């Protein structure tokens, strides 16, 4: 059993839900990314999603697009991200998932990427532009190395798509609570609760909900039906206003409040 499975099993045993925090790797630099992973865990994060910056991020709203641009301008590359994960693995066993697009992995070489990622201590990969129908080769290589491949479900996913994701996915299922791009929203869409309940009846993997969750109250309401909650844009927006110690303090405070909201 890997770190992702262990984390969800431990949380379920204690009747708790997961807080998954997303930050862009390399924004503002990879040294900050490494120290933030430790801070986020201390503040209450159960899993870390690291965004792999990409020049054409079609699924990302303006907040994460700008964050990707800052990371790329700072010289962030996939090999450097893997080196950062390898370094932080000396300090923590928190599950780390890389989230991004297929192109950087294709350019790195799929087999080489999977080997390098597992060696660095990456636990899973979520590629927003690699649907299950096209993921066969990547999934087979990842399975051999024990790298979880996480797929998305959306409000428009039909029964066939749910079945495919349930069959092919590992780690957890990421339910996108809204159609469109990433970004914090002021309220939770009504369909989320019934959709998540429907999905959970059909799958054995944990179901986490992301896109648009921005405050403890929203996180708490989502956690009432899901196995975990992902918060990204609300955290990443802080990188536009804060840096250094102020950034660490701001994110830690937000994550502590989100964790309390989930536990409420």
Curated annotation (Swiss-Prot):
Pfam families, per the entry: Trp_syntA
GO molecular function, one term: tryptophan synthase activity
Presence of keyword NAD: no
Pathway: Amino-acid biosynthesis; L-tryptophan biosynthesis; L-tryptophan from chorismate: step 5/5
Catalytic activity: (1S,2R)-1-C-(indol-3-yl)glycerol 3-phosphate + L-serine = D-glyceraldehyde 3-phosphate + L-tryptophan + H2O
Keyword Amino-acid biosynthesis: yes
Family from the record: Belongs to the TrpA family.
Protein's UniProt name: Tryptophan synthase alpha chain
Source organism (scientific name): Geotalea daltonii (strain DSM 22248 / JCM 15807 / FRC-32)
Lineage: Bacteria, Pseudomonadati, Thermodesulfobacteriota, Desulfuromonadia, Geobacterales
Gene name of the record: trpA
């Amino acid at each position: 059993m890997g770190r992702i499975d262990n984390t969800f099993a431990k949380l379920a045993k204690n009747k708790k839900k997961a807080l998954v925090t997303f930050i862009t790797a390399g924004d503002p630099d990879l040294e900050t990314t490494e120290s933030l992973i430790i801070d986020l865990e201390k503040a209450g994060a159960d899993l870390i999603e690291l965004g792999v910056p990409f020049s054409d991020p079609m699924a990302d709203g303006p907040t994460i697009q700008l964050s990707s641009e800052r990371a790329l301008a700072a010289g962030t590359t996939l090999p450097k991200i893997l080196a950062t994960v390898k370094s932080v693995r000396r300090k923590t066993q928190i599950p780390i998932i890389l989230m991004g697009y297929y192109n950087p992995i294709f350019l790195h070489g799929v087999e080489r990427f999977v080997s390098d990622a597992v060696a660095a201590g990456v636990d899973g990969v979520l590629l927003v532009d690699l649907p299950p129908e096209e993921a066969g080769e990547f999934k087979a290589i990842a399975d051999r190395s024990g790298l979880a491949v996480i797929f998305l479900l959306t409000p428009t996913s039909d029964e066939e798509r749910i079945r495919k994701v349930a069959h092919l996915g590992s780690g957890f299922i990421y339910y996108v609570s809204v159609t469109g791009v990433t970004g914090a929203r002021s309220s939770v869409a009504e369909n989320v609760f019934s959709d998540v309940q429907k999905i959970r009846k059909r799958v054995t993997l944990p179901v986490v909900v992301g896109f648009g969750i921005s405050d403890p109250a929203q996180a708490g309401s989502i956690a009432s039906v899901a196995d975990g909650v992902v918060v990204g844009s609300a955290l990443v927006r802080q990188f536009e206003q804060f840096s250094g110690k102020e950034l660490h303090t701001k994110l830690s405070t937000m994550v502590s409040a989100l964790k309390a909201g989930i536990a409420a």
